[in-house]
Each structure stands twice: as structure tokens, then as C-alpha cells.
Curated annotation (Swiss-Prot):
Species of origin: Homo sapiens
The protein, known as: Putative uncharacterized protein PRO3102
Length: 93
């Protein structure tokens, strides 16, 4: 089942410079409670490196300012959540 709600958050993060969003490999953009509620262990096959992490969007819906970090193999556009606090979008070339 598609996770429609998180996609709306693209509008919130669009235009944020990578240098502001990402420091020392950690994304600094806060994640809303509504978003994290949908990023749960049910996405276990898509998780990587930390709990509550899932791939949520398709390339056409992904902003283009993000660095190529934290992506899953075979997933061209990703949302990387860490402990309900931060998120990161990226596109693999």
C-alpha cells in the first residue's frame, strides 16, 4: 500500500541546501510525528543501518538537491529516517 502522506513532506524540504540538510553524514531536517508513524518495522526489507527507516518515494517525486548518500541498492529515490528524528532524500545515478 502506497505511503501517500510522507510524499507531501517533499514540499517542506524542497530547496534546502545539502550543506544545511546534511552535516557529518547526518540529516538535520526534523521529521514530523505523522511521517514517522508510517515509517515502521513493516518496511523491514527496505530498512538500512538504523531502525524506522524506509524507502518511500519514486524519482519523479524526489527533490534534486540531495547528495547521493544513504540510498539502498536498487532504490533510486529514498527517504532515510534515523530514530524518528531526521530524514534524507537522495537519488542514485
Amino acid at each position: 500500500m502506497p505511503l501517500a502522506s510522507p510524499i507531501q513532506h517533499h514540499e517542506v524540504t524542497r530547496g534546502v541546501a545539502p550543506s544545511m540538510a546534511l552535516r557529518d553524514g547526518v540529516c538535520r531536517i526534523p521529521l514530523s510525528a505523522e511521517f514517522t508513524a508510517q515509517c515502521t518495522d513493516s518496511q523491514a526489507p527496505q530498512m538500512k543501518r538504523a531502525p524506522r527507516c524506509c524507502c518511500l518515494a519514486v524519482v519523479a517525486q524526489c527533490p534534486h538537491h540531495c547528495p547521493v548518500l544513504g540510498c539502498w541498492s536498487g532504490c533510486r529515490c529514498c527517504c532515510y529516517c534515523v530514530f524518528e528524528l531526521h530524514w534524507l532524500y537522495c537519488i542514485q545515478e
